[in-house]
């Protein structure tokens, strides 16, 4: 393989989706688990490895699958359990970005690694509320550390807060005096008027599909020059939920620029 490293993760136990997809490729692989923040996490780690001179090319990739996630985190589909209004629909999708050391094209120019944030949300069917404070904390840290503002970006993308989580994030930003037009992959990926997905999409493959599909295509066409991609992850497990534990969350932010 021509790849020096692959950074990959997914939602299945022990990240078997990623390891199975790479097991016959001969690629040096680092497995990740950041839940729905995995695409952003893999991007920033791949960029760091190249920037530090440890790799010439690196792959950032992730995936998710609706039925397997339902079975693992909630109920098997055959059970017929009723979904709550705050729940989100795990996207069956995947995304992969190949990074190199070139000077032209779309580049990763900065990143903010998020801290774990836990505001006491215990409902596994309300991940947007658990993740929104983490998104706020990372955005606040990003603007503060890099001395930048929301208007410095053509678009700010989160993934995947869903409708409720997005409303909470906008409220937190407004309360802090930050005016930002933040769009969410979980809201963008489905047509909620025609598809009953409750609060929208979720899963590693949700933000990965939106980023690697329409967003990077818009950057390549010159419609977007500077994009802030904020991957949010609810770091729960089935066991922690069953034991009544609250849901820790994290958000990593990556700046993509078209030269």
Q: What is the predicted role of each segment?
A:
Residues 1, 43-45, 130-145, 210-215:
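Short, well-ordered amphipathic alpha-helical segments that serve as non-catalytic structural scaffolds
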Residues 9-25, 64-75, 103-113, 174-192:
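Acidic-glycine-rich active-site phosphate/pyrophosphate-binding loop
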Residues 17-19, 44, 69-74, 121, ...:
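Short acidic, glycine/serine/threonine-rich loops at helix termini
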Residues 33-60, 99, 202-223:
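Active-site-proximal alpha-helical scaffold in enzymes
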Residues 76-141, 145-148, 179-196, 229-232, ...:
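Condensing-enzyme catalytic core mediating Claisen C-C bond formation in acyl metabolism
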Residues 134, 140-172:
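Long, repeat-rich segments with strong aromatic
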């Amino acid at each position: 393989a021509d790849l020096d490293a692959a950074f990959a993760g997914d939602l299945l136990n022990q990240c078997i989706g990623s390891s199975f997809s790479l097991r016959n490729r001969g690629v040096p692989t680092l497995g990740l688990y950041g839940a729905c923040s995995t695409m952003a996490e893999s991007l920033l780690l791949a960029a760091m490895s190249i920037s530090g001179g440890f790799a010439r090319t690196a792959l950032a990739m992730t995936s998710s699958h609706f039925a397997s996630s339902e079975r693992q985190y909630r109920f098997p589909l055959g059970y017929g359990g009723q979904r709550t209004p705050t729940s989100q629909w795990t996207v069956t999708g995947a995304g992969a970005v190949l990074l190199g050391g070139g000077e032209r094209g779309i580049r990763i120019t900065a990143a903010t690694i998020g801290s774990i944030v836990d505001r006491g949300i215990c409902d596994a069917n309300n991940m947007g509320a658990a993740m929104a404070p983490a998104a706020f904390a990372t955005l606040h840290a990003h603007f503060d550390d890099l001395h930048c503002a929301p208007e410095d970006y053509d678009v700010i993308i989160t993934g995947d807060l869903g409708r409720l989580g997005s409303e909470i994030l906008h409220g937190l930003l407004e309360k802090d005096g930050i005016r930002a037009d933040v769009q969410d992959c979980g809201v963008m990926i489905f047509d909620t008027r025609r598809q009953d997905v409750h609060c929208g999409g979720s899963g590693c493959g949700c933000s990965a599909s939106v980023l690697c599909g329409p967003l990077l295509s818009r950057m390549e066409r010159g419609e977007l020059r500077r994009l802030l991609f904020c991957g949010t992850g609810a770091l729960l497990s089935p066991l922690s939920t069953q034991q009544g534990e609250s849901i820790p969350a994290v958000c990593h932010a990556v700046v993509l620029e078209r030269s």
